Design a protein with these regions (language model features):
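Structured alpha/beta reader/binder surfaces that contact nucleic acids or chromatin modification marks
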Residues: 1-16
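Mixed-charge (Asp/Glu-Lys/Arg
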Residues: 10-12, 19-253
């Protein structure tokens, strides 16, 4: 029986330097003459041996994660200005950001042709890990499937990764057949992304860049002259959308 170890080549940008192999075929050269062209994972293997195999193992999940730069809008872009408007608007009253987060999830899902039913916002201090509730419908009539969507909203510093403990708290609330949504003005660390992917959590992640882009589109489609006008309209509905209800109640509403 053989175990195969596929080594990571992230440091090389997934590009293999064949000059290493060519050098190994040259009888006049030994390993010390050619190893500098080898992938970093191979050099680590020579140094550490089998004890370092998990660190150098290729991970498909790692390839699916997004680096921080891809989760933050470009400086002075429309998305960047929108994101900063959002953060400034809710500064000092971040609980009210939940109304915007709920609407962003609704807009995002419907834009992807998902049938979504808006639910309610949970009052501050009583959410237990859920800031807003919605429902995803699949199919029609007798055979229709209804899924509870449990949402978490975090209006936090744009340049600091969102806390993994908040993600864990959201996931812990998900029951069988539920899906989650996590909306942040910030970004997700690689560790958090890998955990979500490896454990196959049914969790929609919306980072700061996606948030800024979606809100910009929402404002344009609604005919508002600025993002702030949209934020004011949504904020005016906050109190009327609060409700003390169990998430399961969305299935019969």
């Amino acid at each position: 029986m053989f175990d195969f170890l596929v080594m990571d080549m992230a440091q090389e940008g997934e590009r293999f330097d064949w000059s290493w192999v060519t050098g190994r075929r040259d009888r006049l050269l030994d390993n010390s003459d050619t190893v500098h062209n080898a992938p970093a994972s191979w050099r680590a293997w020579l140094r550490e041996g089998i004890s370092g195999k998990e660190r150098i193992r290729r991970s498909v999940v790692k390839l699916q994660t997004a680096p921080t730069r891809d989760q933050q809008p470009l400086a002075r872009s429309k998305e960047d200005l929108a994101l900063r408007d959002i953060y400034g608007f809710y500064e000092g009253r971040k609980a009210r950001f939940e109304a915007l987060a709920a609407d962003v999830v609704e807009s995002r899902l419907r834009r992807d042709t998902t049938t979504y039913r808006k639910g309610w916002i949970t009052p501050p201090g009583s959410d237990g890990g859920a800031d807003f509730i919605g429902r995803i419908d699949i199919g029609r009539g007798f055979g229709q499937v209804k899924l509870v969507l449990l949402g978490q909203a975090k209006c936090e510093k744009i340049d600091t990764a969102t806390g993994g403990n908040h993600i864990a708290r959201t996931v812990a609330r998900l029951k069988r057949g539920w899906v989650g949504a996590y909306v942040t003005t910030s970004y997700f660390s690689e560790r958090v992304q890998r955990e979500v992917l490896q454990d196959a959590y049914p969790l929609l992640l919306i980072n700061g860049r996606d948030l800024g882009a979606e809100v910009t589109l929402m404002a344009q489609e609604a005919g508002f002259r600025s993002v702030t006008e949209l934020l004011k309209k949504i904020d005016a509905t906050y109190e009327e959308r609060l409700a003390h209800r169990q998430p399961e109640e969305i299935l019969t509403s």
